């Protein structure tokens, strides 16, 4: 988005904003500017903001900020950028930034364009006369012109004694043009070498924030640390004559980040330190072409192994043979060098004889750089005038356009070796000239050669193949889990690896990223480490590398780079066979676990179906197998044959109802099992014989139909839930004085069906208690009293209800505490006696019948009337609050014990759980239905029975599971009675 034009813009000099210095600068620029204003000026700064150029323009590299031009056919401006120029531009940018201006502002564009006009320009390159295509530029001018004809005006003994530079093997000689990088760097270098020394300039500081976006986009770092490190590496190379480190291929980055000067008006030239850096740039821009030839393996050295040398490290191999071509004569090379040196010095009006030996030595070292890099342009070249629009990011990624080597046939068994990725090539130090390269015909026998290393060491090699056949290049690789792997992350990984193997980061060359892997090569180093050694060390320190980089290293090794830029692994160190085996075992265990879980689920489902079938088979003849059917039919025949022997219970005289509880327990015929018995007998007492077998058959068929037809059971339960009792008011229970006596507000007694206490005997002077009488058939005699678990302040009311109703049996269906929630308060003493209002309760005994229930005996006394009674509490322990017991057998056995104690009583049974609804209603429903069947009732309707009891207390049997449990319990009891019939 373009910012609005500010008052201090080009329209005038009287803006109210900004400092006085900036306004004065703008006024001076306006007075000295062109009449056309800034409308005709192309935008500057597209390297920092790509939005400055329209879709019809491209951003070209001008060595500073980038300039928008319409099309790529125009010549690139050649600016003679020096340190004073950079200092001037830096000050202007700082002033513009302090005013809050951006590249989009017209004032910024106008000021920058005026400053760019003041920078000296170099003449555009002219095509070389010998170049047919004319695509290779040649720089002309007094500082950079190379003359290919004529002899030097003179020669001095110092010149004759200088060592001659070698040829590059490609025919680059007298007429070799300079690259754009050389053309820009040679003039200030020569000026420094030939002119008198200047006083040292004060060091200037450069603020990276001014070019922070550019540094971040190109270097992958916001502080530009990589560029500065590279520049310092070049200076160190020139000082120590060591191997150069990787350097940026962009001239503008290094110049903008490192140039310094005195002032804009002082054009005496850059500082000596800067010239050394520029010479490092010039050196790094060179690239030695790699001819196609076979790589010779090195003979084993003492104490070391034989390692294959890298053919791209710039080391030339010398092949000796009887039919080889001889190198050019040394005299011809000397003439060529002297001609080139004289041509360069002629532009300065200096002759060779006027130079000192030190100056000649320095110039000769610089001259050795001139033939290299022929026809190459930093930042990418325009081939054949192709109209291709490139952004600066694409140019910086491509860098130097690599020469495509024609495919050559390889030896049998060797893969094709060609590299399609852009790589940074390293060359020899200029202090160690390369031997001339010769060719060898086919069929030559292997001979020992002396190959010069960068450190000047002589290393024997064996050449056994023709030099015209190159072999595949070997690369070290590290495969990570990040795909694609960024170049910044790959370089960081190699820097950390260099620290672990005690190498410098400059030892890694030809760094590139292929998918999740980073590939590299190793130059000669002091540790004499090869690619295999470095990759092996990377595998050993894999954990440290992963911890420091955050990447997971999957594989390391050495391989050959193919045309697809893929790496053929030769040696793997990342994943050990033990780890692979462990991962395989874990995967197999997971699959086996899934299969086992599936099998268990299927078995459980099959077992559930089988259990249902067995239950149906046990309930009636239709669902039973053949043996059960025959047994059932035989049972029916025996029952019909002996029917006269069994009379109905109505014809028999009822036993006396005045026997006490103590007599029941003292009767020897009815003695209970041992107190420590854990599994009570199922048929402990004889089943009653007054059930008609036809009635039992009808009941079993009814239960079987319910168990088979789940939909019918669901519909029946829905109808029960929709049933509403009439009347159903609970005004008394909701009264102000009675609401606190209720444990659960949803389960209250109806006004027409509630237990009323005597007010004169009640400690609270109220007749209310949360209890409901449940009538079976006689309204004058309720069979049950359904009540809630007593609260701490209603225990006295509970014992008053027990005393006034004459109850002798209490059925408790809940534990005192369940899952940390109190279900009922203890209303009896732990031991001894306790007084509740006027009722004294003594604990006589506590009989643990089994793990599911226990029996307690109490002695109850009214201290006012001195009357005493005995009563029994049956406490069932294994019934969860929101569910049902795991089996019906413990509850049915519990019911038998209760009825055995209650037999012959005319008083109601007090049944309570926590809320007096769910478990209480389920027990009452089961007991009422079974009692009716025992009395010989022909028709049984369990749903109608539940509606009958719900008319007297709401919420009895709270869930469908409890209703189904009641049906199952009734069916089990009927089946037990039929099995107990005499044979």
Curated annotation (Swiss-Prot):
Biased composition (Low complexity): 652-681
Ranges of the Cytoplasmic topological domain: 605-983
Gene Ontology biological process terms in this record: dense core granule maturation; insulin secretion; insulin secretion involved in cellular response to glucose stimulus; luteinization; positive regulation of transcription by RNA polymerase II; positive regulation of type B pancreatic cell proliferation; regulation of secretion; response to cAMP
Domain Tyrosine-protein phosphatase per the UniProt entry, residue ranges: 713-973
Transmembrane segments: 580-604
Ranges of biased composition (kind: Polar residues): 148-158
This protein's GO CC annotations: axon terminus; endosome; Golgi apparatus; neuronal cell body; neuronal dense core vesicle membrane; nucleus; perikaryon; plasma membrane
Glycyl lysine isopeptide (Lys-Gly) (interchain with G-Cter in SUMO), cross-linked positions: 758
Segments of this protein annotated with the region Sufficient for dimerization of proICA512: 453-579, 605-736
Presence of the UniProt keyword Phosphoprotein in the record: yes
Statement: the UniProt record of this protein carries the keyword Disulfide bond: yes
UniProt-annotated site: Cleavage, residues: 452-453
InterPro entries, A to Z: IA-2/IA-2_beta, Prot-tyrosine_phosphatase-like, PTP_cat, Receptor_IA-2_dom, Receptor_IA-2_ectodomain_sf, RESP18_dom, Tyr_Pase_AS, Tyr_Pase_cat
Comment block on domains: The RESP18 homology domain is sufficient for targeting proICA512 to secretory granules.
Name of this chain's protein: Receptor-type tyrosine-protein phosphatase-like N
Originating organism: Rattus norvegicus (Rat)
Biological classification of the source: Eukaryota, Metazoa, Chordata, Craniata, Vertebrata
Gene designation: Ptprn
